[in-house]
């Protein structure tokens, strides 16, 4: 055999081997994160399995390398697995046409080092309804990048959603960012989701009155909007915005205009790198149902609960709308969660206050199937957002959330799967401190608060005597029904009593076994001790330290 023949033979072996190795390398890349829905339940799939975001959002000005050490330290102390971090248009394109993604490089690299996933928040045309994060060359050139006009034709603080060049350049910068994320992260999937703009809408102005906006306002309402957002004028099914929606016309129109603007950006970004995308909402008063017409009392045009359907119609490349919760009242939080948890809208809380009172709502949200929760300002920058959040900027701020996240962290994958399967429920202690009931398959749980761990309230001489440390509401419990008669529950500062319901209604029942423990890295339950006797005779009394129990129940014949 000649040397040429040997060389040709080696080539025939090596070439297929190279293709095989290349295919193996490609197959090793993690699956792209995606949001999935099944039977009205949702899951954020990360690395091919449901993922529970134990998240925190950094302060607005922590998006620079020098601030990151204080961010990672706080997330570690919080037992968090995800960081929400803003990337601003002014930051990446300070000079028109020149892009700088060096901070994004640093952020992604350090996130991997700290084993943290990322949700990128795009501060573009709108941040808290304003133009603060636009590049200077956009902010002040109102001829090229027009602002909204009021009824008198005067400029207002927010830029117009009908400004074609503003949209085109916001979209270009966003696409550049998505291209860069794909370039640096497609083999790792550190970045799992993107928020497009931030708390859009306008305070004090119902809509844009500029020439383009006025012309659009007088046009027929798009059929896709009418199909989802029920007309407010009786007997009308088509027409312009006023004809179809009457007193609601201006708010609905502004919502459609902004949602359409966001859709253009999201669609272009997903064409480059198809990560899940969402919008967040500065909320209106949740107790106003049915919602009243806009009266200057909230940000018109944002994805408030009453216009989610308009956003669904105008922005199909946005996966869901999410509430920013800075209302500590338990009744309002429940209304908000109920409004945003929909079969067509995944529940997530991208921002909420970082004051201690908010920590208990993590149990309620995760029990309701939320894919993630993120207290705002969860870093050690010496900046407090009190009174919306905590007075503290150190570990005292993190601690209430660290305790709750600490019980979910070992079972984060299991919990996300159970929620996707519709097995979970949750409650948070109400401001009225009243007991709450949770109906599950065959069983009912009654959750009460401020109880002593031993005995019943009627045993007390002073019926106004309560367990110390419960002066402020802080209890919560999340349940997962993992079998016909078996539950995993996590909670704190609460008493849980089970009784038969549904098929077990009226049947004598009792606790078969109660184990305290946790899940190991492989998802296997590890028992630490069995509860019985005094620890179960008066219900399951969860202490101030968050605790995980595995409970098995049974019925018997009288």
Walk through the language-model features, giving the residues of each:
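Aromatic- and carboxylate-lined catalytic core of secreted/periplasmic carbohydrate-active enzymes
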Residues: 363-500
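The substrate-binding groove and active-site-proximal loops of carbohydrate-active enzymes
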Residues: 53-63, 86-104, 152-172, 242-259, ...
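Catalytic-core region of carbohydrate-active enzymes that cleave or remodel glycosidic bonds
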Residues: 116, 263-275, 306-410
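Polysaccharide-binding and catalytic clefts of secreted carbohydrate-active enzymes
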Residues: 143-308
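N-terminal carbohydrate-binding accessory modules
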Residues: 29-81
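N-terminal signal peptide c-region/cleavage motif recognized by signal peptidases
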Residues: 22-23
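Short, acidic/polar
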Residues: 61-77, 299-314, 332-333, 359-362
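Aromatic-lined substrate-binding rim segments of carbohydrate-active enzymes
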Residues: 68-142, 258-272
